[in-house]
Amino acid sequence: MNQKFLDIYTDSIKNPENFWKKISENIFWYKKPTKILNSDNPPFYKWFQDGTTNTCYNAVDLHVKNGNGEKIAIIYDSPITNSQKKITYAELKDQV
């Protein structure tokens, strides 16, 4: 494994709350969480408990909004039917 990956992995294990706080800054939130990890009731941990986001918006719509609508989002490649289809982010947004 490369060293950068190992450093990131080690950080995520040693300091998970800070690690996921940094990661969470890279996604869109309707309401940003004020607390990253609620560990009051182990082993039932709650992450980003008071935050509100939308996974579909982050995975699809945001790419279109940022000017990447014509980039390929999904490649369907079937060896059974010997067919391939490519779907852009814009097409995917219209379909979901």
Task: Give the residues covered by each predicted segment.
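Short, charged, surface-exposed hinge/linker loops at domain edges
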Residues: 4, 24-53
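A short N-terminal helical cap/helix-turn-helix that marks the beginning
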Residues: 13-31, 51-75
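Short His/Asp/Glu-rich catalytic/ion-coordination signatures at enzyme active sites or charged loops
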Residues: 1
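Conserved AMP-binding/adenylate-forming core of the ANL superfamily
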Residues: 56, 74-96
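Intrinsically disordered, low-complexity regions enriched in Ser/Pro/Gly/Gln/His and often acidic
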Residues: 12-13, 40
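Short amphipathic alpha-helical segments
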Residues: 5, 70-72, 80
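Adenylate-forming
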Residues: 6-11
